[in-house]
Amino acid sequence: MTSSTRASEFVTDTMGLVLHIEQRRLPSPVKAIFDAVESGNATVYVPAMVLAEMLYLAEKHRISLSLRAVAEHLEQFQHYREYPMSFAVIQAAAHITDIPELHDRLIAGTARFLHLDLITNDPTIQASTFVRTVW
């Protein structure tokens, strides 16, 4: 499923946020979303699972970001909102049958629960019929 709900609110997956904070190249629509967040014109929810994956990737040296750098970035811009993993999010994820990887399903479940588009470059998530995506 692709695009469009509340035009100024989104959920991000791990790589979307990593690529943005590392100032790596992003497609124009995604760059525009993150630019809007940082100018106060949009909100991006960051699922707890995204932060946990960032910890794991940093510890395994698969990304150059530290958790401290992530925290500083999120604190610098007030329109990033951490979103907790709750039973309601887990229930939303339980309905997603076409994303087999649990962590991805929990991130997609957050977007589904919030009824928001998910910023992701993951082809499995993009192909899902349960969540709308933007990339």
Please describe what each predicted stretch is.
Residues L17, L51, I90, I125-Q126:
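A generic structural signal for short hydrophobic patches within well-formed alpha-helices
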Residues M1-S8, F77, A108-W135:
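Acidic, PIN/NYN-like endoribonuclease modules and their adjacent C-terminal/linker elements
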Residues M1-V46, E59-E72, S128:
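Short, well-structured N-terminal submotif of metal-dependent ribonuclease cores
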Residues T14, A48, F87, D104-R105:
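Conserved glycosyltransferase catalytic-site signature
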